Curated annotation (Swiss-Prot):
Gene3D superfamilies: Aspartate Aminotransferase, domain 1, Type I PLP-dependent aspartate aminotransferase-like (Major domain)
Residues recorded as bearing N6-(pyridoxal phosphate)lysine in the entry: 249
Species this chain originates from: Synechococcus sp. (strain WH7803)
Cofactor dependence: pyridoxal 5'-phosphate
Protein name: LL-diaminopimelate aminotransferase
Length: 408
């Protein structure tokens, strides 16, 4: 009998969102007439921008001709998309990032997991708590942790608690670590980082030869022009950071799949013998071996995000979801709940009322208001007593959900 990867057996009962799905399915089976409103998983609801749809239609038509047909594309992404990304997302903000350092992919979730392929198993890993579960689970799957304890924390990981007490800003670790996951704007708390806060992390990473894995999937939702959108706005970050970005939330590509990862040339790790090795070369080799590239049609759609029309439509989508977040903040605050986030991110982080635990509040909203959210404890032990609501839904559903919750 074939032997399985035993690391998967260390995983807790289920990934957070499938567990939510199981509970919702059971509720719906018992209550078939209930009109559920889902403010849990961060999936967008509004249509793709017209500029992107038009570009993809043109690409589809081109694929129907001998002259315009495209087969396998470059694993790293087409040059015209990489150039557009470098120009609009990085050079426009003063970041020294070239097109060659951008690798187009089918999702930042995939990349934040796959990046472990090029990093050694012995690295000491630090994550915030609460945290996007993929960072933890992918390290468990890769054999970088021990077993989970009673609170769900895995042996071998360094957990950096974030809460209202520290402004949802993790403290620099007291012990040296090699790999640091940072996400700003933060999922799940909605917190943001200033340039000064990111500089402290960059300084730590450079002083300790650590690598920062920076998830900027929600950077488009930042409203304050003084806040950084990229780790590469910080001097020295090229020497110690990799950044993940996505078209999923700003341009609605959750169903079409397009993202990118930035690996600066010259960024180095070390081999077992101590020799310095360029990470760009390793990631390029990894992608060339294990990835066939994103569809030509989808990449043309992503390129259109950077057109004048595309930029205007993306701005409109971001504004729509941020207004949803503002409604959630306002209405739940008026209902007496303590609210965080939702000002620079599409997530609102709620302190559960009356000492209720996270899953208890989940069941309460599901059963009494027919509203689905995400229990904070699913993001880590320090998320217990909190609850996340997503602003990704129609205005009518957000208004109705708030009315139901306020009526409880």
């Amino acid at each position: 009998m074939v032997q399985v990867n035993g690391n998967y057996l260390k995983l807790k009962a289920g990934y957070l969102f499938p567990e939510i799905g199981r509970r919702v399915k059971a509720f719906s089976a018992a209550n078939p007439d209930a009109a559920l409103i889902r403010l849990g998983i961060g999936d967008v609801t509004e249509p793709l921008p017209q500029a992107c749809r038009d570009a993809m239609k043109t690409a589809i038509d081109a694929m129907g001709t001998a002259e315009g047909f495209h087969g396998y594309g470059p694993e790293q992404g087409y040059g015209w998309l990489r150039e557009a990304i470098a120009t609009h997302d990085f050079k426009a903000r003063g970041c020294d990032i070239s097109a060659e350092e951008i690798f187009v992919s089918d999702g930042s979730k995939c990349d934040s997991s796959n990046i472990l392929d090029i990093l050694g198993e012995g690295n000491r890993v630090a994550v915030t708590d609460p945290v996007y579960p993929v960072y933890v689970d992918s390290n468990v799957m890769a054999g970088r942790t021990g077993d989970a304890g009673d609170e769900g924390r895995y042996a071998g990981l360094t957990y950096l608690p974030i809460s209202a007490d520290n402004g949802f800003a993790a403290q620099i670790p007291s012990d040296p670590v090699d790999l640091i996951y940072l996400c700003f704007p933060n999922n799940p708390t909605g917190a943001v980082a200033t340039k000064e806060q990111l500089k402290a992390w960059v300084d730590y990473a450079r002083a300790n030869d650590a690598l920062i894995l920076f998830d900027a999937a929600y950077e488009a939702f930042i409203q304050d022009p003084s806040l950084p959108h990229s780790i590469f706005e910080i001097e020295g970050a090229r020497d110690c950071a990799i950044e993940f970005r996505s078209f999923s939330k700003n341009a609605g590509f959750t169903g079409t799949r397009c993202a990118f990862t930035v690996v600066p040339k010259g960024l180095k790790g070390k081999a077992a013998n101590g020799e310095a090795v360029e990470l760009w070369s390793l990631w390029n080799r990894r992608q060339s071996t294990k990835f066939n590239g994103v569809s030509y049609i989808i990449q043309r759609g992503a390129e259109a995000v950077y057109s004048e029309a595309g930029q205007a439509e993306v701005k409109g989508l971001v504004s729509f979801y941020m207004e949803n977040a503002a409604i959630i903040r306002r209405e739940l605050s008026a209902a007496g709940l303590t609210i965080y986030g939702g000002e620079h991110a599409p997530y609102v982080w709620i302190k559960t009322p009356d000492g209720m635990d996270s899953w208890g509040f989940f069941d309460h909203l599901l059963n009494k208001a027919n509203v689905v959210g995400t229990p904070g404890s699913g993001f880590g032990a320090a998320g217990e007593g909190y609850f996340r609501l997503s602003a990704f839904n129609s205005r009518a559903n957000v208004d109705e959900a708030m009315a139901r919750i306020k009526a409880l």
